């Protein structure tokens, strides 16, 4: 290469670096703005095609303080986890760039190539469809996704293996694949063509061109982050409000059998959940003072604290608002045992809808996003049990007043609780739509009238036993 050509190449690299840094800072400046975005870069490809070198070069061209890289070898799918679960904790906040060097597509290929029970074509394509739907949900929630496949011909791969330093011979069978095996190479290439039609394909033959093309693809993505799904709100058809939300029986006098029945059921529930090899997620929603805390207390009464996690959900923190609204729930589903939510992801279609924190387009879209989320859980050996605890307005007022006059319960009542009563009917309408759009065979709603606290607690425990048995019978 002559001096003039070298000088031109250096100049081009300097300009590319400057362009990348400017685009990087432009993205950072969208944080907390109406046009806020983040970028996820999924990197996969043939080994020795230069993925690692391209990522290292990218770090030299951008401001490395604000480029995040998560690098993991592919692993087989865990049947008790949705495909996205190992990664969602690392979803970037607004203004951030995250490279996932190793991602769910690598896991899909590893599973298809190595699992003792190979994936058939239908299941493989179902995974791809679910992955694309998840990526679209990310995009709709301001996380753009760039997918890059580094390719390399069989001939070039073999030459690079021949030229390798003996100390790096472990690459020969990296990730369990024998890269000297032409049949395995061909199988991998055939499989990846079933999902890379919407990927940027980078030819790994020429090192300089490879690095430049990778950086250029990222620059293009940063400069042209699309406005995803900015659709007009639908003409909304309000669902009818179920009678159980408005018609309540007068609470009965204390049942003489209540304590013995409660004792029996708490033990049965503990035994059933403890002996079940699936994960159990129990979700509570309902009006304030409807008895969510009391019901949860009875559910865990016979369990050891090490067997369960309880998450009490309040208004999101600022760092949570900078990510998709489901992110703070994805990150709370790490337990392999029992997880209980005192308020849930349904805040998107309840309080965020009623109080105007979510736009009409956002809360209308959320029903489908939530259904996909719950379907992913259900398909990953998780029993999802959802409760709405219903109470009438007069009983709620009586419980509020009782809290105010009880020293150890005063902390449970605030001015906001009283103010929310002004929007009672709006919350009922939101709840009715929620039931209409998210009551599914894999995650049904149990609506429990709680004017009678004792009867409500019994019904909650019975419903848990019923759902555990129903899901087991359909497995």
From Swiss-Prot:
Q: How does it assemble?
A: Homodimer and homotetramer.
Please state which protein family the record places this protein in. Belongs to the polyphosphate kinase 2 (PPK2) family. Class II subfamily.
Tell me which Pfam families the record gives: PPK2
Relate the activity to temperature as described in the entry. Answer: Optimum temperature is 50 degrees Celsius.
Which InterPro entries does the entry link to? Answer: P-loop_NTPase, PPK2-related
From which source organism is this entry? Acinetobacter johnsonii
Q: Where is this region: PPK2 2?
A: 256-472
Cited function: Uses inorganic polyphosphate (polyP) as a donor to convert AMP to ADP. Can also use GMP, UMP, CMP, TMP or deoxyribonucleoside monophosphates, with lower efficiency. Cannot use low-molecular weight polyP as donors. Can also catalyze the synthesis of polyP from ADP or GDP, with lower efficiency.
Q: What is its EC number?
A: 2.7.4.33
Question: Domain of life, per the record?
Answer: Bacteria
Task: Kindly list the cofactors needed.
Answer: Mg(2+)
Q: What is this protein called?
A: Polyphosphate:AMP phosphotransferase
The top EC class is transferase
Record keywords? Kinase, Magnesium, Repeat, Transferase
Positions of the region PPK2 1? 18-222
Quote the catalytic activity from the record.
[phosphate](n) + ADP = [phosphate](n+1) + AMP
Entry keyword annotation includes Cell inner membrane: no
Q: Which PANTHER family match?
A: POLYPHOSPHATE:AMP PHOSPHOTRANSFERASE-RELATED (PTHR34383)
GO MF entries: kinase activity
pH behavior: Optimum pH is 6.5-8.5. Optimum pH is 8.0-9.0.
Q: How is the cofactor bound?
A: Lower concentrations of MgCl(2) are required to obtain optimum polyP synthetic activity, whereas higher concentrations of MgCl(2) are necessary for optimum PAP activity.
């Amino acid at each position: 290469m002559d001096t003039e050509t070298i000088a031109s190449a250096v100049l081009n690299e300097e300009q590319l670096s400057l362009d990348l840094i400017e685009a990087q800072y432009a993205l950072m400046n969208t944080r907390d703005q109406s046009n806020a975005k983040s970028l996820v870069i999924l990197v996969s490809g043939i080994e020795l095609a230069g993925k690692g070198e391209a990522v290292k070069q990218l770090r030299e061209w951008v401001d490395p303080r604000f480029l995040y890289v998560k690098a993991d070898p592919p692993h087989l799918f865990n049947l008790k986890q949705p495909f996205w679960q190992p990664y969602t904790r690392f979803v970037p906040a607004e203004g951030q760039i995250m490279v996932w060097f190793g991602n769910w597509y690598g896991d899909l290929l590893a599973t298809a190539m190595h699992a003792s029970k190979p994936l058939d074509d239908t299941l493989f394509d179902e995974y791809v469809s679910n992955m694309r739907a998840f990526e679209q949900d990310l995009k709709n929630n301001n996380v753009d996704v760039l997918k890059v496949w580094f390719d390399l011909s069989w001939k070039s791969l073999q030459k690079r293996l021949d030229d390798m330093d003996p100390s790096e011979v472990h690459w020969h069978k990296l990730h369990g694949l024998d890269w000297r095996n032409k049949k395995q190479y061909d199988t991998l290439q055939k499989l990846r063509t079933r999902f890379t039609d919407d990927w940027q394909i980078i030819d790994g033959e020429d090192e300089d061109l490879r690095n430049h093309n990778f950086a250029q693809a990222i620059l293009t993505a940063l400069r042209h982050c699309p406005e995803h799904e900015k659709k007009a709100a639908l003409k909304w058809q309000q669902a009818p409000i179920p009678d159980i939300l408005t018609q309540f029986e007068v609470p009965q006098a204390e049942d003489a059998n209540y304590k013995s029945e409660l004792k029996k059921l708490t033990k049965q529930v503990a035994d059933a959940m403890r002996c079940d090899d699936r994960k159990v997620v129990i979700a509570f929603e309902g009006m304030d003072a409807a008895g969510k805390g009391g019901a949860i207390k009875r559910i865990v009464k016979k369990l050891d604290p090490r067997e369960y996690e309880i998450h009490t959900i309040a208004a999101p923190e600022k760092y949570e608002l900078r990510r998709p609204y489901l992110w703070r729930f994805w990150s709370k589903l790490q337990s392999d045992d029992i997880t209980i939510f005192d308020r849930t992801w349904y805040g998107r279609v309840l309080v965020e809808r009623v109080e105007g924190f979510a736009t009409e387009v956002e809360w209308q879209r959320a029903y489908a996003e939530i259904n996909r989320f719950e379907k992913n859980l259900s398909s990953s050996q998780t029993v999802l049990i959802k409760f709405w605890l219903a109470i009438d307005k007069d009983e709620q007022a009586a419980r509020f007043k009782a809290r105010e006059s009880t020293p150890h319960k005063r902390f449970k009542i605030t001015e906001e609780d009283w103010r929310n009563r002004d929007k009672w009917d709006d919350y009922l309408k939101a709840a009715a739509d929620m039931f209409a759009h998210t009551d599914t065979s894999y995650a049904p709603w149990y609506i429990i009238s709680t004017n009678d606290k004792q009867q409500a607690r019994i019904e909650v425990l019975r419903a848990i036993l019923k759902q555990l048995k129903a899901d087991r019978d359909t497995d």
